[in-house]
Design a protein with these regions (language model features):
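In a subset of proteins, long, contiguous C-terminal domains/tails are tracked
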Residues: 2, 403-432, 471-473, 487-507
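C-terminal outer-membrane/trafficking sorting elements
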Residues: 41, 439-507
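N-terminal signal peptide c-region/cleavage motif recognized by signal peptidases
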Residues: 14-16
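Sec-dependent signal peptide recognition
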Residues: 2-9
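Amphipathic, positively biased hydrophobic alpha-helical segments used for protein targeting
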Residues: 9-11, 54, 76, 379, ...
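Histidine-/acidic-rich catalytic cores in large beta-rich domains
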Residues: 20-434
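Residues in flexible loops and secondary-structure boundaries
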Residues: 9-12, 161, 178, 224, ...
């Protein structure tokens, strides 16, 4: 007879009011290096992925404990001058270093860039596509003399055979406008009347890396994508609920706007409106702050590289004018999108290693602390500095050596639970500290029984309960207080209760 044992962990995760760093892990790779590192809150190494090819910029941990990373594939097929951290290939890597799947995106006209994000189980890549000077001039670009590489996104779904398939794409080229030549496509009489489109002439310069999109994030609740452009000094939101055909048009999707820009912020002069340029130069790593009750949940957050001065960066929070009733970002006629300035700001200490003029990343932890990864840039050997500050700006964790773009994962992230059996060190983190308690013992009035269990468990909580296996796959979701587990294999499971931030492990 099989037995499924439940162990309640006396671990209550709450919003902390005292000044302390948040427990969890940091994931990073050094640009140009072959190894990705996972360290715990005490800066001890917990796991590494050692690969035969170098990482370029971004690595992320999936809920199943696997790593997703960009790497440099056959980039020689594309004229890559001035491409920062070129890519051409993306991989999903198992904890033991084996390649689950790999996908090459590099040919004479396209190449993946250095950033990516997860869309559920899929991977969204930033990429370039080549446009000749002839194509540029035909589209209304002013006197193009060389090729440009406008941004596009491709979403990949693993095909189960070691590769992946493109299931969705969006191209900035489909959403350009110009006001210089009425005889050419995409002509508009007034750029400021069309903030949903990108002025093809708003950026000049000789580099093919025209916009340099360097950060991308996905919001599952809104089904939207946000991305940042270093050279435009601006961030943008687009609709992801579209088909690829709708994404190439101006209608369709939840927004009804197809692939047009839903929201933009940081530099109103890009669409010919007056207003403060809150992003004076480079910007990196725009992302949504998780909206789960943590401070400023639902805001956007950016690493504003020169937000304070040329030598001092800022982590800015932006409360967007999203309206739930109309499902739109509100904007007054003739005015730029609000807010007129940042909503929240943490001013990084001036100079290296706490500020950075390029690359870099940030995140907001569930206790309100801000995680910062200031890159030392290409000249810094692909490394950077990671640290965590509280609401007063006091450094509570770090500084410690990191990479160009790090990610912080808290103890209850399913990918951390799935990765635990593969970690070389679990004793120096509090994430896995647990004292088993017998059946009918309580944690904050919560009771689970019987323990061990064979076919049913009872939990005296009416909230939604989700049970995950050790690979981070959800196997049960129910609001019932009595749960049938007879169909589950023996093993360790993680139970998450939606209306309570309490973590349990079921054995």
């Amino acid at each position: 007879m099989k037995k499924i044992r439940f162990t309640l962990l006396a671990l209550l995760i709450v919003t902390l009011t005292s000044a302390q760093n948040f427990n969890g892990f940091a994931l990073y790779n050094e640009g140009g290096g072959n190894t990705t590192y996972l360290i715990d809150e005490n800066q001890n190494l917990a796991h590494t992925w050692n690969m035969s090819t170098e990482c370029n910029y971004t690595v992320q941990l999936k809920e199943n404990g696997n790593l997703v990373r960009g790497t440099k594939g056959n980039a020689s097929v594309f004229s890559t001058g001035n491409i920062a951290s070129g890519a051409g290939q993306v991989q999903e890597i198992a904890p033991d270093g084996s390649i689950v799947w790999s996908f090459d995106y590099a040919d004479n006209d396209h190449i993946s860039h250095h950033d990516l994000t997860l869309v559920g189980d899929n991977v969204l890549l930033t990429a370039y596509e080549k446009k000749s000077s002839t194509e540029l001039n035909a589209a209304g670009f002013n006197n193009a003399s060389s090729e440009k590489w406008p941004t596009h996104f491709v979403e990949l779904e693993a095909d189960g055979n070691g590769g992946a398939t493109i299931v969705w794409e969006w191209h900035i080229w489909d959403h350009m406008c110009q006001d210089t030549d009425p005889s050419k496509p995409n002509y508009v009489a007034n750029i400021s009347y069309n903030p949903e489109l990108i002025d093809i002439n708003m950026l000049s310069g000789g580099s093919g890396d025209w916009f340099h999109v360097n950060g991308v994030d996905y919001n599952e609740d809104l089904d939207q994508i946000v991305f940042s452009s270093r050279f435009a000094s601006e961030i943008y939101i687009i609709d992801h609920s579209t088909t690829s055909a709708e994404a190439a048009s101006h209608t369709g999707g939840n927004s009804g706007m197809g692939g047009d820009i839903l929201y933009r912020w940081g530099n109103p002069s890009n669409y010919d409106l007056s207003g403060a340029q809150v992003i004076p130069n480079a910007v990196h790593d725009v992302r949504w702050i998780t909206d789960d009750g943590r401070p400023n949940g639902g805001f956007l957050q950016i690493f504003n590289n020169s937000g304070v001065s040329n030598n001092q960066s800022a982590i800015d929070g932006i409360e967007t004018p999203w309206d739930d009733n109309t499902n739109t970002y509100l904007r007054s006629s003739g005015q730029p999108f609000s807010p007129s300035s940042y909503t929240t700001r943490y001013e990084c200490t001036s100079g290296s290693p706490y500020s950075a003029d390029g690359q870099s990343a940030s995140d907001r932890m569930s206790n309100g602390n801000i995680f910062v990864n200031a890159s030392l840039g290409q000249g810094g050997g692909g490394s950077g500095t990671m640290y965590e500050v509280d609401s007063l700006g006091t450094i509570l964790w770090g500084p410690t050596s990191g990479g160009l773009k790090g990610f912080r994962y808290e103890c209850d992230y399913p990918g951390i639970t799935a990765l635990e059996p593969f970690m070389t060190n679990t004793t120096s983190t509090s994430c896995f500290d647990a004292t088993p308690i017998s059946e009918n013992d309580e944690v904050d009035n919560l009771v689970l029984f019987p323990n061990p269990a064979i076919d049913h468990i009872t939990i005296n909580n009416k909230g939604v309960k989700e049970i995950y296996n050790i690979m981070g796959v959800r196997v049960v979701k129910t609001s019932s207080t009595e749960i049938n587990v007879n169909h589950l294999a023996s093993g360790i499971y993680n139970i998450r209760i939606a209306d309570r931030n309490i973590k349990f492990i079921k054995k």
